[in-house]
């Protein structure tokens, strides 16, 4: 039989041997294009995380095939019971009728300070540990604050790739931003590139995440030292997003008050603000609760523009009584009790959130191999001389497909992701989140679909 007829026949037979859903895939391109037009999405490569999920759910409904939702970082583990019980008790005591203290409840502030000492070996006074409505509000409010400190210094520098919504926040606020992709600037190359951006004198704050969303690399101690020293030299604030604290599963992190500790910028400069979320550490995302930890030195520092904007000169006071007050009037009262108790239990060694979160590494290891076995490659693959840790996210590319092209093709095969272009990355690929791979049969579906994708897109 002629080879040109044999290949389609083999592909058809392969589909028959796989799950019934495979017969419904890939989604017809006209159906897919029509849906994008209906949703007013002109370019799939710029679709937000929520838009990607909405596209997948609409196609899921139309096709009847179960989609694999690899696009959104929803916790895939149950919320910590100790937090639920503490919040229920707080609600039963009547806190729902009371506005929360803008500074945060005393117990939360004290336990946040203690938790930072236990897991980062960092001393931050309870005064500077301030609850926010998730880290999303934390970044939004700190961007605004940092842009109002010094005349002419109003730009946020993103060390990319990063969380796409944070860049959207600067656009909404009308704050200028700058960025560079760390892909080509790891190790000794980081300092010169970072200094090139700082030399202009307009950078108000630097933001990054470590472990990184989306690539899951971890900045090394040397890289953190470089950032810290340059932040001090150029008097710039570093906003460190530790949403995935202690989740570098290559290291024995997570033993309270014992080394090794979570690497942090706080060891190398006083100009830091740490964002610490309950969403992933404790799977408490629905209650929207986080901590902004402002260094003692920074909290008490006075800035020339603050009285102009907020009628007060001290950074910490302006943050609490002007910025946060204006955007939320305090974080949810009962959720503060939940977070306080989870932080206490973790610092006391009663709640091992790191071992619980290691489930994500197991899912990543299994699914990552499936991608690699079917011709994909890991985009951000190395931390210095060792492979990146397995964890909540990883990044994959396929041949020379652009980020948008790969995202579009994967979604037609029932796999929703987000394009790396939305994260500030200059590399081609997509972000994969493993949190919603909750059932063993989903891994079977993933393997089937990747095999089909590879058969339809030969290398």
Can you say where each PLM-predicted feature lies in the sequence?
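Conserved glycine-rich beta-strand-loop-beta hairpin in the small C-terminal domain of fold type I
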Residues: 333-336, 340, 353-368, 378-397
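Short hydrophobic/aromatic beta-strand micro-patches
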Residues: 293, 395-397, 433-435
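Conserved core of the PLP fold type I
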Residues: 95-234, 239, 245-268, 273
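Conserved core segment of the aminotransferase class I/II
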Residues: 28, 268-358
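N-terminal small-domain helix-loop-helix segment of the aminotransferase-like
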Residues: 26-29, 38-137, 188, 343-350, ...
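PLP-dependent enzyme catalytic core of the Aspartate aminotransferase-like
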Residues: 114, 118, 122-125, 268, ...
């Amino acid at each position: 039989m002629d080879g040109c007829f044999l290949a389609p026949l083999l592909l058809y037979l392969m589909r028959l041997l796989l799950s019934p859903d495979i017969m419904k895939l890939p989604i017809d391109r006209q159906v897919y294009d029509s849906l994008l037009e209906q949703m007013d999405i002109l370019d799939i490569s710029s679709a937000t995380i929520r838009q990607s999920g909405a596209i997948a759910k609409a196609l899921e409904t139309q096709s009847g095939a179960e989609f694999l939702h690899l696009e959104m970082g929803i916790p895939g583990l149950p919320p910590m019971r100790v937090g639920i019980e503490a919040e229920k008790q707080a609600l039963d005591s009547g806190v729902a009728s009371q506005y929360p203290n803008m500074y945060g409840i005393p117990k939360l502030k004290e336990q946040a300070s203690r938790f930072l000492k236990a897991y980062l070996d960092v001393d931050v006074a309870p005064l500077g540990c301030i609850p926010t409505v998730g880290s999303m509000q934390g970044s939004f409010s700190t961007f605004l604050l940092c842009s109002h400190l010094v005349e002419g210094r109003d730009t946020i520098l993103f060390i990319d790739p990063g969380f796409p919504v944070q860049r959207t926040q600067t656009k909404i606020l009308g704050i200028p931003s700058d960025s560079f992709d760390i892909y080509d600037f790891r190790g000794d190359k980081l300092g010169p590139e970072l200094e090139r951006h700082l030399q202009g004198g307009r950078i108000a704050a630097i933001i990054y995440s470590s472990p990184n969303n989306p690539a899951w690399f971890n900045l090394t101690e040397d890289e953190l030292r470089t950032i810290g020293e340059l932040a001090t030299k150029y008097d710039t604030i570093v906003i460190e997003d530790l949403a995935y604290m202690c989740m570098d599963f290559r290291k024995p992190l997570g033993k309270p008050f014992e080394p090794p500790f979570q690497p942090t910028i706080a060891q190398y400069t006083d100009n830091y603000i740490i964002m610490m979320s309950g969403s992933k550490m404790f799977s408490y995302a629905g209650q929207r609760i986080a901590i902004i930890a402002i260094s003692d030195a920074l909290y008490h520092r006075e800035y020339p523009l603050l009285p102009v904007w907020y009628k007060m000169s001290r950074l910490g006071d302006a943050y609490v009584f002007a910025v946060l007050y204006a955007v939320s009037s305090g974080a949810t009262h009962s959720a503060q009790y939940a977070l306080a108790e989870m932080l206490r239990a973790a610092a006391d060694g009663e709640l091992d959130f790191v071992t619980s979160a290691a489930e994500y590494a197991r899912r990543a290891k299994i699914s990552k191999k499936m991608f690699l076995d079917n011709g994909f490659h890991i985009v951000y693959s190395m931390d210095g001389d060792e492979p990146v840790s397995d964890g909540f996210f990883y990044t994959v590319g396929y041949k020379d497909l652009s980020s948008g092209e790969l995202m579009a093709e994967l979604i037609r095969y029932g796999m929703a992701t987000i394009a790396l272009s939305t994260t500030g990355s200059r590399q081609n690929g997509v972000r994969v989140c493993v949190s919603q791979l909750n059932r063993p049969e989903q891994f079977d579906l993933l393997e089937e679909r990747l095999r089909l994708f590879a058969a339809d897109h030969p290398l």
